[in-house]
Amino acid sequence: MISGSVRFLVNLESLNGVESIGNLTKHRTAPVVLKTSTGYLVRYVPVISGEALAHAYQASLVDIAKKEGLPVGSLSSQYEFIKFSTDEALKIEGIKEPKDYNDARRFEVEVMLKDVIADVGGFMYAGGAPVRRTSRIKLGYMIPALRGDEIPAQLEAQFHVRFSNKPVSGSQAIFNVEVSSALYTFSFELDEDLIAVPSTFGEKVKGEEELERQKAKRVKSAIKALYSLLSGNFGGKRSRFLPSMKLMSLVVTKTDFPFMPEPAHDDDYIKTTIMRLGKAKGVLNGNLAKAYVINNEGIEVGEGVTVLSTVEDLVVKLEEE
């Protein structure tokens, strides 16, 4: 299992808009609870949804999988991650719907062989005999670091005018876009051991041997696709609101047991993660427990970690293990 917590310093972004009200395009916000010197408080803060991060990850996986010669479905090739949710989608992809629950494993394997994105990112067929595959990549909301009384985040609407050099009614318009600046954090988990492995119970079906043959390539592609998230290549409205973005720090662990690093709110999150990792290895009788750190803000990282300089170095390390 590969898991991580990440900190980005992001200035002037509009990566996750949610709606337009008149001439105002709003940024996504959500309530968070934080502990302050006076007790627990609720605050609404700018956020970037896990769906936005997952879309960027899967789009990156499409490009990487094609280069690796792995199968990508017709809809996924268009970066439309409807996958195999409806009968209409099955017709487009050339997959026969499941007859009943006993046919679910056959259906899941055929879908996985057709589209590596459905293998890694999961899918939910909602027809007469529903079949679900849980995503092997898990992503939460990207939220500001919760650091005591002050949250390092701010929203403000920026004024713009669409200019016209001719006096035509409606051609020159005012519009406002909410932008955010924040010290953002997010966490992720990639269960690479379960990639190319059917999740539906039942006897082995045709095609599983081919999945086993492709597994190494599929895992490699899934790890490479993390690069888009760790390098900040995600979100929308980038053509005119490309943010000033810097990776401040991260900790990524690779284990053979379930483990999630500390959220990147406090400055000791890496040190605490390393301390917990050693204890978790003992509690769960683990054999593999490695930690990789990038530290561009001079915080404590603890002992027994591999400190790297760049995200590129990190991805290479994860592939090698």
UniProtKB/Swiss-Prot annotation:
One record GO biological process: defense response to virus
Keywords, in A-Z order: Antiviral defense, RNA-binding
Glycosyltransferase is among the record's keywords: no
GO molecular function, one term: RNA binding
Pfam families according to UniProt: DevR (PF01905)
Signal sequence extent: none
InterPro entries attached to this UniProt entry: Cas7/Cst2/DevR_sub_I-a/Apern (IPR002764), CRISPR-assoc_Cas7/Cst2/DevR (IPR010154), CRISPR-Cas7/Cst2/DevR (IPR052681)
Keyword RNA-binding annotated: yes
Highest taxon listed in the record's lineage: Archaea
Extra information: Crystallography and cloning were done with strain P2, while interaction experiments were done with genes cloned from strain P2 but over-expressed in P1. The aCascade complex was purified from strain P1.
Family: Belongs to the CRISPR-associated protein Cas7/Cst2/DevR family. Subtype I-a/Apern subfamily.
NCBIfam families per the UniProt record, alphabetical: cas_MJ0381, DevR_archaea
Role noted for this protein: CRISPR (clustered regularly interspaced short palindromic repeat) is an adaptive immune system that provides protection against mobile genetic elements (viruses, transposable elements and conjugative plasmids). CRISPR clusters contain spacers, sequences complementary to antecedent mobile elements, and target invading nucleic acids. CRISPR clusters are transcribed and processed into CRISPR RNA (crRNA).
Subunit structure: Part of the aCascade ribonucleoprotein complex, minimally composed of Csa2 and Cas5a, which binds crRNA. Other possible components of aCascade in strain P1 are Cas6b (SSO1437) and Csa5 (SSO1443), while SSO1399, Cas5b (SSO1400) and SSO1401 have sometimes been seen weakly associated. Csa2 is probably the major RNA-binding subunit. The Csa2-Cas5a-crRNA complex also binds target DNA homologous to crRNA, probably forming an R-loop. Purified aCascade forms a filament about 6 nm in width.
The name this protein goes by in its record: CRISPR-associated aCascade subunit Cas7/Csa2 2
Organism: Saccharolobus solfataricus (strain ATCC 35092 / DSM 1617 / JCM 11322 / P2) (Sulfolobus solfataricus)
The organism's taxonomic lineage, starting at the top: Archaea, Thermoproteota, Thermoprotei, Sulfolobales, Sulfolobaceae
Gene: csa2b
